[in-house]
């Protein structure tokens, strides 16, 4: 209990007092490429998904309430998303072992990518950082089949986000 309060206090402090720097990502720009490992230690490059839509969502921490809600909603909507020629990639600074437990516990059918050094989150301006403490922000980027940012979300409601993503993908593909 004590450690949970300390961790929650630290997370609140990071969110309250850290700055994100410049707003570096803009719609229409090329999405920064990366190579990260998933929960099965399989490498994924963004460029491997050229020709498909990509829902790249950053989240703070495996198996926490909001992150679990968001991931499970993407799980429940995965067939509708894939019918739209899109793939879901989740990213946090958690390690691959944590991702494997989280994915296994909730039956997540998409890659959870480990950004342990937070370089990818930083390149997408999706990082809270306070010294050695780093946490991914809850941001989502829709990347078109040409590898460009089609839309991004800085304020995400985990309860309805996957439904919103489906509606936007349908609109973008008209």
Language-model features: locations:
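Short, acidic, Ser/Thr-enriched surface-loop or helix-capping motifs
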Residues: 25, 38-39, 143-144
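N-proximal helix/coil linker or "cap" segments that precede and/or mark the start of modular domains
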Residues: 3-33
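Structural microenvironment flanking redox-active thiols in thiol-disulfide oxidoreductases
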Residues: 68-108, 119-120
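Thiol-/selenol-based redox modules, centered on thioredoxin-like
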Residues: 135-174
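A short beta-strand-turn-helix
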Residues: 34-53
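Short active-site neighborhood of thiol/selenol oxidoreductases, capturing the structured segment around
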Residues: 47-68
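Short loop/turn microsegments at loop-to-beta-strand junctions
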Residues: 31-32, 53, 137-139
């Amino acid at each position: 209990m004590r450690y949970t309060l300390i961790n929650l206090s630290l997370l609140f402090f990071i969110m309250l007092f850290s700055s994100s720097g410049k707003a570096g990502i803009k719609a229409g720009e090329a999405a920064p490429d990366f190579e990260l490992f998933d929960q099965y230690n399989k490498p994924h490059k963004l460029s491997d998904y050229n020709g498909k839509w990509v829902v790249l969502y950053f989240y703070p921490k495996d198996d926490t309430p909001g992150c679990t809600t968001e991931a499970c909603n993407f799980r429940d909507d995965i067939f509708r998303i894939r019918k739209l020629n899109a793939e879901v990639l989740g990213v946090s600074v958690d390690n691959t072992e944590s991702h494997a437990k989280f994915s296994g516990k909730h039956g997540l059918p998409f890659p959870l990518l480990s950004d342990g050094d937070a370089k990818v989150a930083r390149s997408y301006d999706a990082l809270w950082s306070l010294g050695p403490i780093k946490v991914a922000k809850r941001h989502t980027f829709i990347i078109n089949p040409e590898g460009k940012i089609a839309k991004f979300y800085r304020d995400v409601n985990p309860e309805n986000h996957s439904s919103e993503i489906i509606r936007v993908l349908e609109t973008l593909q008209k």
